[in-house]
């Protein structure tokens, strides 16, 4: 389904950019003050790429990017699965019925409270992405250790739940 981009690359894009941007922008100040700046996109017109507040050259310094070739029309379905409101199973059923892959970005507590849904996401071939444990504003994290813990705690419970490493 993800013809031009591997699941691993697709998952790593948001995490890689966020990590690169925050660490790169405030690496020297991570232990003394929260990183300054925030990532965002502006959508000015329909059917045009969004405008980012970091240039392609700035992102390239950290081997990060947010957009690829826009000539090929590819749709990526992503779900911010921060909590379960009773719709995830129905969504998974519809995706399976239509043979469509998607990415579900989950927080740690979601995996804790919905292990069977997470196992099904994995079994059905969807990407399960890391959305941190508590969903904090990562640009405001005061230490590198707390920043990393938000990510590694999710990776750990995902592996305990599914038996697989998070891609």
Can you say where each PLM-predicted feature lies in the sequence?
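Generic low-complexity, intrinsically disordered sequence content enriched
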Residues: 16-22, 34, 45, 96, ...
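Non-membrane alpha-helical structural segments and their capping/turn regions in soluble enzymes
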Residues: 144-149
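Cyclophilin-type peptidyl-prolyl cis-trans isomerase
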Residues: 166-167
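Generic N-terminal simple sequence motifs
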Residues: 10, 45-46
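Ser/Thr/Pro/Gly-rich low-complexity linker/stalk segments immediately outside membranes or between
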Residues: 30-42
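Sec-dependent N-terminal signal peptides of Gram-positive bacterial secreted proteins and lipoproteins
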Residues: 2-29
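Active-site beta->alpha N-cap acidic-glycine motif
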Residues: 47-142, 153-157, 162-163
């Amino acid at each position: 389904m993800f013809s031009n981009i591997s699941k691993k690359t697709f998952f790593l894009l948001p995490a890689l950019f966020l990590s690169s941007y925050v660490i790169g922008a405030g690496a020297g100040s991570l232990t003394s003050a929260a990183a300054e700046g925030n990532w965002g996109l502006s959508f000015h017109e329909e059917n045009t790429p969004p405008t980012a507040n970091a240039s392609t050259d700035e992102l390239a310094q950290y081997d990060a990017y947010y957009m690829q070739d826009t000539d090929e029309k590819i749709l990526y379905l992503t779900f911010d699965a921060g909590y379960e409101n009773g719709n995830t199973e129905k969504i998974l059923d519809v995706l399976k019925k239509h043979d469509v892959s998607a990415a579900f970005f989950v927080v740690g507590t979601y995996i804790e409270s919905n292990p069977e849904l997470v196992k099904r996401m994995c079994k059905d071939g969807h990407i399960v992405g890391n959305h941190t444990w508590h969903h904090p504003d990562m640009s405001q994290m005061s230490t590198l250790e707390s920043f990393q813990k938000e990510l590694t705690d999710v990776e750990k419970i995902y592996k305990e739940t599914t038996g697989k490493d998070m891609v």
